[in-house]
Amino acid sequence: MPLFDSFAISASGMTSNRLWLDLITNNIVNINTAGKPGDPNLQPYRRQVPVFSELLEATTNSVPGKERYRRMGVHVPRITEDPASPRLVHDPSHPYADEKGYVAYPNINIANEMVNMITATRAYEASVTAINSAKSMAMKALEIGRG
């Protein structure tokens, strides 16, 4: 693998994990965003989840019909909304309460979001460490080249 590919792969991981952290933050911020059950115009916030995918690059020496690919990191081709039903809370005094007195809130579990946040942070840190290691190797190679 060429040296600069390691920078690109690590950078793609950092970018994807930063997006994941942004989505987690959005989920936590909107945990108490209310909606009105049954009203399509007043639906509660839906938890957003990134879909991760490999970045693949076709190699130049591929035989037609037998393409070969190099792994070039990760990216987020799309963001999905959690299909889980909203949680209903009985609060007849709320302005969004339905005729039975229920208000819809996002079905977001704060503990799961915190675990995801720690996971994304650790993955981001691993990418930073990989970039620093690649940088150190490049510097050593330059020193060796100088003689």
Enumerate the language-model features and the residues they cover:
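Amphipathic alpha-helical polymerization modules
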Residues: 1-147
